[in-house]
Each structure stands twice: as C-alpha cells, then as structure tokens.
Design a protein with these regions (language model features):
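Alpha-helical packing segments of well-folded alpha/beta enzyme cores
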Residues: 31, 79, 98-101, 142, ...
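Non-cysteine beta-strand/loop elements that form the S-adenosyl-L-methionine
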Residues: 41-51, 113-119, 152-157, 201
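Histidine/acidic-residue-rich catalytic or RNA/ligand-binding cores of hydrolases
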Residues: 102-103, 125-129, 162-172, 208-222, ...
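Aromatic-lined glycan-binding groove of carbohydrate-active enzymes
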Residues: 135-167
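Mid-to-C-terminal alpha-helical segments outside catalytic/metal-binding sites
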Residues: 186-190, 194-201, 208-253
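Conserved, mostly hydrophobic/aromatic
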Residues: 16, 46, 83, 118, ...
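Glycine-enriched alpha-helix->loop->beta-strand junction motifs that scaffold or abut catalytic
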Residues: 41-42, 84-89, 108-115, 148-152, ...
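Active-site gating/metal-coordination segments in enzymes
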Residues: 1-98, 104-107, 120, 133-135, ...
C-alpha cells in the first residue's frame, strides 16, 4: 500500500522482516526469491520463533507453540544458508538456554547479521526471587558469550512478557514507568554492557508487552534506564542500530 504512491509520503513498512520456516532447507530459496520479487526494496530479513520450554509452563501464554527442535532439524542450516546468500538478516526468538545454539549459528555464518529478540528471553516463569536470580546469572553468562560474535545484535525489549517472572501480568493496578525501570534495569544494562550501544536497539514489542504495562510507560521506562547514556549512545539505541541493521533510510525525528 505504501509503495503504491497513493498515500503520499507515507513510509509504512519501509523495511520488512518476514517469516519463513528454515526447516525447508534448500527449497526455501524459491520462496525467498518470490518474496524479494514482491518487495525488493523492503524485505530485509527473516524471523523465526523457536522458543522451547521443556516444562511446558511457558506455553500457557503461547496459543500456538512453535515446533520443538527447530535448530536441530537436518535442513535448518541449509535453509539459513539460503537466507544468508540473499543478504537477509535473521531475527532469532529463543529462550536463554537456546542462546548457545544461536551462537553456533553466528560462528558458522559470520557474514550474516543475527538479531537476538526480546533481550534473549530469560525464562524465569513461576520462580521465586532466588530462582529468578539463578536464571539471571545464567542468562547473563549466555548473553555475554553470544555477544562475542560481531555479527550478532540485541533487540532490547519484550520485558513485559510473562516469561521473565516479574508477574506484572497478574497485577490489576496500573504500573508506572519507574517501577518498570527498576525491574528491567539489570537486564537492559547487562545487554548494553555486553553488546555495546552500537549493537543494541530498543523495541516496544507491543502489543504483546501490554500484558504488563501500557505503551507510554514502557517507552518511558526504557528511556529512563539509559538517561545517563551519552547522546551518541542514545542515538544508537533508539535509531542508528535499527536503521543500519534493517537498512532503513529514514531521518532521525
């Protein structure tokens, strides 16, 4: 619609990250070629949800759980190669125990940009404070390990999802940005310290994050957490990294 020119200077979907199942292997090439023919100036990458929870607890928040063992599928790597050969990026939605598998993928395809979604999704659902702390330590270890690969970026957000164990989704009172910032700060700061602002981008993950908070307090919380950052760091977090990774030629607002 935006490309039709009927809506003036509208730049809706200036860049698109589509879906494809990499388990199709080499057959994925034809699908990607058709997608690129349809949106040659807009298709930037592919995203696949690959979250796995052996306990099954997380799936009560996921109406249609993704298949298990996606990255272990015998055709997955060849499917990824089709994506890589076309210069597309890959958005990986996984829980933190799976980050090592994504790291192996980054090592195998060093010229392809991989974007870790939702800050690496620390899976701490239904845990008490001690349990969440143990998960935080393991998540931090995994995030720091994958950050060593220069072709990996981190999308900071998704913190309103229930998987983190904050239990904001159980609340009935409005949650303000300061309370969100206090809970989220260790995760946001860890991600930025691991990747650097130049490889991090802020995301709203809305409406899924609406389980926990409103759109305005969400963004205010993220901005509040990094309020002491330099102007260059803020520009990277809220504009430059996303513009570079997804090749979006839009001026800063």
């Amino acid at each position: 619609m935006a490309a039709s020119g009927f809506f003036g200077e509208c730049r809706i979907c200036a860049a698109i990250v589509g879906y494809a199942d990499l388990r199709f292997g080499d057959e994925l090439g034809d699908y990607l070629d058709r997608a690129l023919e349809r949106a040659p100036e807009r298709l930037r990458g592919i995203r696949q949800v690959m979250i796995e929870d052996p306990t099954g607890a997380a799936y009560r928040f996921v109406p249609i759980p993704p298949p298990s063992g996606v990255m272990q599928h015998p055709n997955f790597e060849s499917g990824f190669r089709q994506l890589a050969q076309r210069g597309l990026s890959f958005d990986a939605a996984v829980f933190h125990p799976q980050l090592s598998e994504v790291a192996a993928l980054a090592a195998a395809f060093p010229d392809t940009t991989i974007v870790i979604n939702h800050t690496g999704h620390a899976l701490a659902l239904d845990l008490d404070a001690d349990g969440r702390e143990r998960v935080f330590v393991e998540w931090r270890k995994q995030l720091r390990a994958i950050a060593r690969y220069p072709n990996v970026c981190c999308k900071i957000g998704g913190l309103g999802l229930p998987f983190w164990g904050f239990r904001f989704e159980e609340r009935t009172d409005p949650i303000g940005y300061l309370e969100l910032a206090d809970a989220w700060r260790p995760y946001v700061e860890t991600a930025i310290e691991a990747f650097g602002a130049e490889r991090c981008m802020m995301e709203s993950d809305y409406p899924p994050d609406s389980r926990s908070c409103g759109y305005v307090p969400l963004w205010n919380a993220l901005k509040h957490i990094v309020r002491a950052a330099s102007n260059d760091e803020k520009a990277a977090l809220f504009h430059h990294t996303a513009a570079r990774v997804y090749r979006i030629e839009l001026p800063m607002l």
